[in-house]
Amino acid sequence: VQNKDVFSDVLVSLPEIRDSRGALTVIERDERYSFERVFWIYDVPEGSERGGHAHRTCAELLFAVHGSFDVELCNGHERKIFHLDSPSTGLIIRPMIWCRLFNFSADYVGLCMASQKYIPEGYINDWQTFCDSL
């Protein structure tokens, strides 16, 4: 089974610099954080979910820049829920991991860094197709 250790080393802590002017968190390009696309999510209606898919080859790094949300990851056999509520903590979603985002706070603003540009064929949007692909 691919990604058997789906839950190991998926949380990323970035340095946070605070002073009287506010806070700053920075991420610099390195092998772990190579990205081709960045997008943000906001104004999520109460009770809504996002995600509900897996990527064949794309990895993502998710952040709650403001507010909070929950992310459920599944490798087809095991599931784990992560609660993100800090702009300096990110969650890596590796390829071939089913991902569901939910429980968004009303003030949520999220940032996603993706390792590839948008490729519709790279998505698996059906749970059974995902399981059959493992």
Model segments located where?
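Structured catalytic cores of enzymes that bind and process phosphorylated ligands/cofactors
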Residues: 100-101, 108
